[in-house]
Every structure is written in structure tokens, then in C-alpha cells.
Swiss-Prot record:
A Pfam entry, by short name: ATP-synt_C
Protein name stated in the entry: ATP synthase subunit c
Listed transmembrane segments: 8-28, 52-72
One GO CC term on file: plasma membrane
Organism: Rickettsia peacockii (strain Rustic)
Length: 74
């Protein structure tokens, strides 16, 4: 195999990182909705923590995307 094909295989494998970020964000907000349904008075605190967690999970997906773009264009 030549280097170009290996770059595209590596880029395809980077999609796993983006898939993991999507699963993480969906789990965070699923848990948020069920927690708010159980205890509506804690909504503000739960939302703040969920948004921080979603931001961190989404950052991992963005890092994966940046690395994939570096692999393609380098």
C-alpha cells in the first residue's frame, strides 16, 4: 500500500472518534432529561453540568476531525 491509501484509511478510522462523541452527547442529554423529570427543582444545576459535559465530549469529536483533516492535507 502506498502512503496516500494509508492516509485515507487513517482518516476513516478517525470517524470512530466522531461517532464516540455523538454517543457521549446523546447519553449526556438522555440522562439530563430523565434527571429533570425526577427532580425538576434541580434543573439549573443539572443543565449547567450537562452543558459542560457535552462541551467536553464534543471537543473530543472536534479534535478527531482536526486530526483527520491534518492526515488528509499533509
Amino acid at each position: 500500500m502506498d502512503m496516500v491509501s494509508l492516509k485515507f484509511i487513517g482518516t476513516g478510522l478517525m470517524a470512530i472518534g466522531m461517532y464516540g462523541a455523538a454517543l457521549g452527547v446523546s447519553n449526556i442529554f438522555s440522562s439530563l432529561l430523565s434527571s429533570i423529570a425526577r427532580n425538576p427543582s434541580a434543573t439549573e444545576n443539572l443543565q449547567r453540568m450537562a452543558l459542560i459535559g457535552a462541551g467536553l465530549a464534543e471537543a473530543m469529536g472536534l479534535f478527531s476531525f482536526v486530526i483527520a483533516m491534518l492526515l488528509i492535507f499533509s
